[in-house]
Amino acid sequence: MAHHTHQDWLDRAARLRPPTGHHIDGADEPGGGPSFAVVSPRDGRTIAEVADGGAAEVGLAVAAARRAFDAGPWPRLAPADRGRALMRLADLIEEHRAELALTISLEMGKPITEAYEIELRAAITTFRWYGQLADKLADEAPHVAPDAFALITREPSGVVGAVVPWNFPLTLASWKIAPALAAGCTVVLKPSELSPLSALTLGRLAAEAGLPPGVLNVVAGDGPGAGRALGLHPDVDVLAFTGSTAVGRHFLRYSADSNLKRVWLELGGKSPNIILPDAPDLDQAAATAAWGIFFNQGEMCTAPSRLLVHRSIAERVTDAVIERARTLRVGDPLDPGTEMGALVRESHLDKVLGHIDAGSDQGARLRTGGARTLTGTGGSYLEPTVFDRVAPDSRLAREEIFGPVLSVLAFDELDEAISLANATEYGLAAGLWTSDLSTAHRVSRALRAGTVWVNCYEEGDLTVPFGGMKQSGNGRDKSIHAIDKYTELKTTWIQL
């Protein structure tokens, strides 16, 4: 990565020719019907016209996945053989790392350095990790009686529909695809219509890695068309979705209206980040708070968008965050020196600006940012934004913004901080900064969040699960626990 200059990436972008058709039954399907434009948020230009899939294309993909599961070799392979196929796919992603990072940066606006170093590394690691896990899953044989034998086996659920958003198009896809394939399932992936190109490339690489036809299918299309068709399809056994809470509710309804398929949801967040006066390093806490909210343009479900600071240190911490916001380099996502890129599309930028206007109208104090920037580029760029004096019942404090907007709330007592942290419909993640181990345990238990980071933020590993409480979803991605989403437990009782 270090040897690629801004001009290198611009030259590569000029030569980039990603696939633009669906990947169904092991082959690229160019499609002859309607298409939609993929517009780059870096400059507002169309980078590709992609086949627009709907119920017909989803039907073909599900049929291919059904055949591959019911009659194909994949679920019947030795688990070690499935694992080797996943590791071959990881190797191919590694070989095409620059191309995929460039594609992601172009289609959704994140800095190329983050796409290459963080997103692609995560996707590669995920396929390798589950490839290595595939043959490590053991059945159970509990002792039940002297004259009987019981066996508990874990069997693949069947056809999995995976629907993923645009903010981490390959990382989030890999978190669903890799454990599902390791378990022996087949998959139909529907990426966001805002970032389909990297997923379509992944489908092509899966075929090159030797995955049998129908094992991994990719259909491009929007939510009302392809997403709804996948959610309602009676031959889909499991639906795994990452996205907004509102759309997650749709998938629950689709399940109820079709075959009661299992639905796993990783949804929105409004994550609190609590800084106490005894934090081991207040400067580090402030720097991490700034990094967390501005990373990936704040377009993250786990973004620490609510900074809860003890009143005695609120001014110091807030000033440090503001200083970092003002020096953050916002620019062309293809420039390796860019620290914050473009928001995914103009309409999303307008939505974020609406939240900023509402914050000011509801009495919050805008300390820095809050306006468009780089307006001559044609792209959708926003200044890093910080509010303080935010009312706990305001939109800034309660609604997911999904942009680089930080709300600072001061508190006086620890119980008040816990109450503020939990005063939201979401429960995805939270942060806490303290030197007291007892406080860390007490607060972690009290916070209704699937992940609590203490003296850090956004740390993780594939060995630990990820997911939310309350309206942030159900089930868990990552770790061995993700296998539970794509398998069924069967009891076989044999009377001797």
Feature annotation, model-predicted:
Residues 1-50, 84, 88, 138-163, ...:
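Terminal low-complexity tails and localization/encapsulation signals of metabolic enzymes
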Residues 46-53, 70-75, 162, 273-277, ...:
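Short, well-ordered beta-strand elements within core beta-sheets of diverse protein domains
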Residues 45-48, 236, 274, 329, ...:
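Conserved C-terminal structural/oligomerization subdomain of aldehyde/semialdehyde dehydrogenase
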Residues 138-284, 411:
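Rossmann-like NAD(P) dinucleotide-binding subdomain of oxidoreductase/dehydrogenase enzymes
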Residues 44, 82, 104, 127, ...:
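Residue-level signal for inorganic ion chemistry
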Residues 45-137:
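Glycine-rich loop-to-alpha-helix module at the N-terminal edge of alpha/beta enzyme cores
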Residues 186-188, 366, 451:
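A short hydrophobic/small-residue beta-strand
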Residues 238, 246-391, 454:
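ALDH superfamily catalytic-core signature
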